[in-house]
Swiss-Prot record:
One of its GO terms (molecular function) is endochitinase activity. It comes from Hevea brasiliensis. Changing L296R: In hevamine-B. Coiled coil: none annotated. This is Hevamine-A. Its EC number is 3.2.1.14, 3.2.1.17.
Length: 311
């Protein structure tokens, strides 16, 4: 009996070690939160333990002398100071090891960079109001975010590389400032191509949707795999993520059924050493469709087949 118990314990230890090493080398899920008041709080989002990265969306007014403005849809009213409570959610996420970024831009808004000096002004604003600096008017309260996400979809195509350099330089003052980006899948991205060439970005979640030449369509994975390979071999970034809509209605096109992602696409993209996981738009649609729950284990582990072999 004792030998059998010992054998079972050794088997469980072996499984644990394999799963743990696979997870370390594997990926995670990034989610966009903030654009629907019915998607739950930031604290609730992170308490699901499904996400490794959360992008707060969006700071969609800034640059060219404008007073910066954050838009969190139905969650809170920043103009009345009603979003400072979000600091509680930020800290709750960070305690669990989840990185939280502020996302700049989005599909709708008034944002641009007019010059290198303008980029410096925006960087200073972000540092003082959301990162490690000091300001009496921090829109999300006193919590210090982990970094800044670039989701630039219109406006100027210039000076985003300067903004990245200025923000990255703040890492020298203590806590690292993570830089992330959500370019469109056509390569190179019109707005962020130059910025990504700086090599300063830690995580790049490419949007493989709303762009038929580089997305999944009707059973055909060739376009999305070819585009993935182009991105992973062409830019110098820490990790690259497969950006997808979390439900069919979350995007105009490019939705990938979970079974297709798990059986056909993930095995291909995991071959890249730059594989970081999957990005989903957005928390609201993920709640409706349960997408992250369907794919989580497959995203996390690089070598799930090894666990099956041991079992």
């Amino acid at each position: 009996m004792a030998k059998r118990t010992q054998a079972i314990l050794l088997l469980l230890l072996a499984i644990s070690l394999i799963m743990s090493s696979s997870h370390v080398d594997g990926g995670g899920i990034a989610i966009y939160w903030g654009q629907n008041g019915n998607e739950g709080t930031l604290t609730q989002t992170c308490s699901t333990r499904k996400y490794s990265y959360v992008n707060i969306a969006f700071l969609n007014k800034f640059g060219n002398g404008q007073t910066p403005q954050i838009n969190l849809a139905g969650h809170c009213n920043p103009a009345a100071g009603g979003c400072t409570i979000v600091s509680n959610g930020i800290r709750s996420c960070q305690i669990q090891g989840i990185k939280v970024m502020l996302s700049l831009g989005g599909g709708i808004g008034s944002y641009t960079l007019a010059s290198q000096a303008d980029a410096k002004n925006v960087a200073d604003y972000l540092w003082n109001n959301f990162l490690g600096g000091k300001s009496s008017s921090r829109p999300l309260g006193d919590a210090v975010l982990d970094g800044i996400d670039f989701d630039i979809e219109h406006g100027s195509t210039l000076y985003w590389d300067d903004l990245a350099r200025y923000l990255s330089a703040y890492s020298k003052q203590g806590k690292k400032v993570y830089l992330t980006a959500a370019p469109q899948c056509p390569f190179p991205d019109r707005y962020l191509g130059t910025a990504l060439n700086t090599g300063l970005f830690d995580y790049v979640w490419v949007q493989f949707y709303n762009n038929p030449p580089c997305q999944y369509s009707s059973g055909n994975i060739n376009n999305i795999i070819n585009s993935w390979n182009r991105w992973t071999t062409s830019i110098n970034a820490g990790k690259i993520f497969l950006g997808l809509p979390a439900a069919p209605e979350a995007a105009g096109s490019g939705y990938v059924p979970p079974d297709v992602l798990i059986s056909r696409i993930l095995p291909e993209i995991k071959k890249s050493p730059k594989y970081g996981g999957v990005m989903l738009w957005s928390k609201f649609y993920d709640d409706k469709n349960g997408y992250s729950s369907s794919i989580l284990d497959s995203v996390l582990f690089l070598h799930s087949e090894e666990c099956m072999t041991v079992l």
